[in-house]
């Protein structure tokens, strides 16, 4: 008896095969299965943001003007978070809050929940798109892994942090000035700049910028002479098969500058991947900690001595006073529904006063 080994082929294509052929067809803009998640979610997230910043007020949720229609500009317009009283409601258009009324839904902050959720799924869809394309052209999936850093930051800041607090109200609104105010809030209420996870995030992002600048300059400096052109771009031939720069020369240069240098390209480029992605993940972990109200570094001995000795003050104790001022001002302004009134004697003052 003979057993034939071979690839099983179906006589005719089923619906899945037809869909797969169409979605993964070679075209100018790749769609793919990930596109079924990415494109609708990105469209709705961006559309919701443009709609909110153009037309929708924040009067009912924050007591603010936040749209172009009310006189804001690109830096001050925002899609604001729902009111504190709505807690963690999903704010569905057909839910008990809006009851199908689109105008009321916008007034309650429904667009923020809409943009945040669709934005998160759009980012995940973009990462899956990189996985799918990498698999199609037989690349390793490090682009997608790197993009997990921005996704982690977005999800931790816009979703996990407010879930740990009393409601979506305490998430950032989607706007430039709104994000700045959220950063001030993080500093005043969480002392974020003295949080070790924030420090690792700053080191990762700024370190990555430094690495990019050094790497780009080094490659430009060690390019081979490919032709008689007047500059790098005229002389460069995009179809040449050989390498365009000298790793040996670059290694020798940085060995003389620093005493150490990367010995091969794999280690160099992995390090350029590792530094920013690790920084972003550390920042995301720190924000998850803030969602649970974990504290940053506290130098209590300095605070006690500053309270006892009017002549003793450090940059740390000055910053603690500044944080108290931020809390005293922002709490009353951002949460008018709480009717917070601080008497003059509890407002922070420097030791000199």
UniProtKB/Swiss-Prot annotation:
Gene name of the encoded protein: psbD
EC number: 1.10.3.9
Species whose genome carries this gene: Arabidopsis thaliana (Mouse-ear cress)
GO MF term set: chlorophyll binding; electron transporter, transferring electrons within the cyclic electron transport pathway of photosynthesis activity; iron ion binding; mRNA binding; oxygen evolving activity
Residues reported to bind a plastoquinone: 215, 262
Other facts noted in the record for this chain: 2 of the reaction center chlorophylls (ChlD1 and ChlD2) are entirely coordinated by water.
GO CC entries: chloroplast; chloroplast thylakoid; chloroplast thylakoid membrane; photosystem II; plastid; thylakoid
N-acetylthreonine, modified sites: 2
PANTHER family hit by this protein: PHOTOSYSTEM II D2 PROTEIN, PHOTOSYSTEM II PROTEIN D1
Residues bound to chlorophyll a PD2: 198
Highest taxon of source: Eukaryota
PTM section of the record: Phosphorylation occurs in normal plant growth light conditions. Rapid dephosphorylation occurs during heat shock.
Membrane topology: Multi-pass membrane protein
Keyword Acetylation: yes
Name of the protein in its database record: Photosystem II D2 protein
Record flagged with keyword Transmembrane helix: yes
Gene3D superfamilies attached to this UniProt entry: Photosystem II protein D1-like (1.20.85.10)
SUPFAM superfamilies xref list: Bacterial photosystem II reaction centre, L and M subunits
InterPro entries tied to this protein: D1/D2, Photo_II_D1/D2_sf, Photo_RC_L/M, Photo_RC_L/M_CS, PSII_PsbD/D2
Summary of subunit composition and partner proteins: PSII is composed of 1 copy each of membrane proteins PsbA, PsbB, PsbC, PsbD, PsbE, PsbF, PsbH, PsbI, PsbJ, PsbK, PsbL, PsbM, PsbT, PsbX, PsbY, PsbZ, Psb30/Ycf12, at least 3 peripheral proteins of the oxygen-evolving complex and a large number of cofactors. It forms dimeric complexes. Interacts with PAM68.
Main localization (coarse): plastid
